[in-house]
Regions:
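Generic structural signal for well-ordered, non-membrane alpha-helical segments
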Residues: 2, 18-22, 26, 52, ...
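Hydrophobic "anchor" residues on beta-strands that sit immediately upstream
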Residues: 3, 41-43, 177
């Protein structure tokens, strides 16, 4: 594949991955999950890289232009997006992060409705759309246009989920327990 690798679409921000790419990923996904009498719902998270803000906005613009509603977690972790996709029955999730790559890189990782990496066949279709090798996607009109919602409460739900995983106290650790979700730049 041209853009998607082993874990999403990664590249140097505004060099090999730009807002036009992000917008088109959003347009494709918003259309791909459309079904009769179904409002597409997508949850988006990002790490703390500066370019994450522009990619979040571009993805949300593409998704809403295709009729999807966007739930923005803002700064969070990849596991939280995967968890919330499954728990809240989102059509998909998107994590904006390049993981361990340098700070000037970024990436778009699409998570399917089961909380796993998007299937390669769908990533190939996204690439064809980005390169103009597939049919144009119609714009949503009037009340079909999607909306963006602040969904920072989703991060709280994920933290509660992590806390619920620990049923018994850790002997010798005292009353303080710290959960650390290892993530570069977060």
């Amino acid at each position: 594949m041209k853009y998607f690798g082993t874990d999403g679409f990664r590249g140097e921000a505004n060099v090999t991955l730009n807002v036009e790419h992000a917008y088109k990923v959003g347009r494709f996904l918003g259309n791909y999950f459309q079904k009769e009498d179904h409002k597409v719902r997508v949850v988006i998270g990002k790490d703390t890289r500066l370019s994450g803000y522009m990619f979040e906005t571009a993805l949300a613009s593409g998704l809403t232009a295709s009729g999807a509603d966007v739930y923005e977690l803002h700064v969070t972790t990849t596991p939280s997006v995967s968890y919330l996709v499954r728990k809240e029955n989102f059509d998909c999730g998107i994590m904006i992060s390049a993981s361990h790559n340098p700070y000037f890189d970024n990436g778009i990782k699409v998570i399917n409705g089961k909380g796993h990496k998007l299937e390669p066949e769908i990533e190939e279709q996204i690439e064809k759309y980005i390169d103009g090798e597939s049919e144009e996607i119609p714009m949503a009109k009037r009340e079909a246009i999607g909306r963006c919602f602040d969904y920072t409460k989703g991060r709280d739900e994920y933290i509660e989920y992590l806390k619920d995983l620990v049923k018994e106290p850790f002997d010798g650790f005292g009353k303080w327990i710290c959960f650390y979700d290892c993530k570069r730049n977060l």
